[in-house]
Every structure is written in structure tokens, then in C-alpha cells.
């Protein structure tokens, strides 16, 4: 009887140990499964982190490129602003120079017109401005005690011989040739300037205040 009870107690202990081992193996398997799942999740997290890091790197690269492009555009705009300001200053300077040149031109023209008026009175010579610069047309008055003599002239502006002949003729009549030539030259300059930049007539293409006179035409008296 004692032997049977001893064996029964031994079986219970063995059975308890076996059941305990089974529970331990089940717990171990469950733990291993959890560890595997954790490692798998950790790997997924690491891969996701790597993908995110790569995206962040690409975004940073794009951001840096955009920033460099923006800096270049800002520099370009600043350069354009400087060029625009410089252009405005040049335009202002040019306008000022043009204004000064126009003022000087008006002043010079007024001085020339005054000189022409003075020389015209001094030499008693009156020029037809509308005929210039193609022709030199006018009349010189020689004052006399009893009567005045008119010497008309209607000349091309390119004949050297005509100029020489006219000068000799006027000089023989005691006309101040230097002042007379100066009058014609100034009148020619005014006519040339007033017609610039239009193309001058063919007759005046080589004009240098050179005139001619037809001495065969009769003089007039008053």
C-alpha cells in the first residue's frame, strides 16, 4: 500500500514538473514571438526613419538650390537697380548737356544774327536768307553824295572764280571785303544749321561759303 502511494506522489510531482515545463515553454514561445515582433517593428521604424532622412536630405538640397537661386535673383535685381539708377543719372546728365548745348546754340545763333545785322548795316549788304545755302542772293548798296548805286548778286554757292571776281569788283568800289566775306560766311552758316539734318540741294553739297557773281549783269542806280 505504501509503495502504491509513493508512486502516485512521484507521478504527481513529475506531472507537475511537466506541466510547469510546458507553461515555461509556452511563455518562452510567447516571449520570443513578442521579441520577434518588436525587432520587426524596430526594423520597420529604422527603415521608415532612413526613408524620412533621405526625403529630408532631398528637401534640404532642393531648399539650398532654391535659396541659391533666390540669392542670384536678388543679386540680379540689385544689379538691375544699380544699372537703372546709373542709366537715369546718365539720362539726366545727357538732358542737361543737351539743354546746355541748345542754350549755347541759341546764344551763338543770337550772336551770329547780331553780327549779321551789324555787318549788313556796315557793308550795306542785304542777303536773301531763303536762297541759302544753294545760292547767295542779295544786293550791296554803295552810298554816294548824289545817288546810291545798287550791286545785285544771285550766285551759286560753289564757284571759286565767282567769289574772286565779286571780291575784286567790290574791292574796286571801296567795299570792306573782309567784313563782306564774313557776312556771307555767317549767313551761310546760319542757313546750313537751320536746314540740318535734311539733305541739302545738290548745288550746295560742297558748299564752303564760296560764291560767284555774273559781272555781265548791269548795275542798278537809284
From Swiss-Prot:
Location of this chain's protein in the cell: Nucleus; Chromosome, Centromere, Kinetochore
Main subcellular localisation: nucleus
GO biological process: cell division; meiotic metaphase chromosome alignment; meiotic spindle organization; mitotic metaphase chromosome alignment
Signal peptide: none
Gene Ontology CC terms, in alphabetical order: Ndc80 complex; nucleus
Family: Belongs to the SPC25 family.
Role according to the record: Acts as a component of the essential kinetochore-associated Ndc80 complex, which is required for chromosome segregation and spindle checkpoint activity during meiosis and mitosis. Required for kinetochore integrity and the organization of stable microtubule binding sites in the outer plate of the kinetochore. Participates in SAC signaling that responds specifically to disruptions in spindle microtubule dynamics. The NDC80 complex synergistically enhances the affinity of the SKA1 complex for microtubules and may allow the NDC80 complex to track depolymerizing microtubules.
SUBUNIT field: Component of the Ndc80 complex, which is composed of Ndc80, Nuf2 and Spc25.
Name recorded for this polypeptide: Kinetochore protein Spc25
Source species of the chain: Drosophila simulans (Fruit fly)
Taxonomic lineage from the root: Eukaryota, Metazoa, Ecdysozoa, Arthropoda, Hexapoda
Amino acid at each position: 500500500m505504501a509503495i502504491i502511494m509513493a508512486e502516485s506522489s512521484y507521478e504527481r510531482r513529475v506531472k507537475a514538473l511537466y506541466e510547469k515545463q510546458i507553461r515555461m515553454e509556452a511563455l518562452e514561445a510567447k516571449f520570443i514571438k513578442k521579441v520577434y515582433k518588436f525587432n520587426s517593428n524596430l526594423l520597420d521604424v529604422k527603415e521608415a526613419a532612413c526613408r524620412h532622412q533621405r526625403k529630408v536630405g532631398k528637401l534640404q538640397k532642393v531648399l539650398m538650390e532654391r535659396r541659391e537661386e533666390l540669392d542670384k535673383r536678388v543679386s540680379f535685381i540689385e544689379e538691375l537697380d544699380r544699372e537703372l539708377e546709373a542709366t537715369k543719372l546718365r539720362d539726366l546728365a545727357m538732358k542737361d548737356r543737351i539743354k546746355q548745348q541748345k542754350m549755347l546754340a541759341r546764344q551763338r545763333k543770337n550772336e551770329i544774327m547780331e553780327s549779321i545785322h551789324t555787318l549788313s548795316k556796315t557793308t550795306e549788304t542785304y542777303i536773301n536768307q531763303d536762297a541759302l545755302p544753294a545760292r547767295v542772293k542779295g544786293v550791296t548798296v554803295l552810298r554816294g553824295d548824289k545817288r546810291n548805286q545798287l550791286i545785285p548778286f544771285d550766285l551759286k554757292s560753289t564757284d571759286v572764280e565767282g567769289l574772286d571776281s565779286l571780291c575784286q569788283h567790290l574791292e574796286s568800289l571801296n567795299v570792306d571785303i573782309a567784313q563782306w566775306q564774313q557776312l556771307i560766311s555767317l549767313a551761310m552758316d546760319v542757313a546750313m544749321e537751320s536746314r540740318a539734318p535734311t539733305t541739302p540741294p545738290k548745288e550746295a553739297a560742297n558748299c564752303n561759303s564760296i560764291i560767284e557773281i555774273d559781272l555781265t549783269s548791269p548795275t542798278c542806280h537809284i
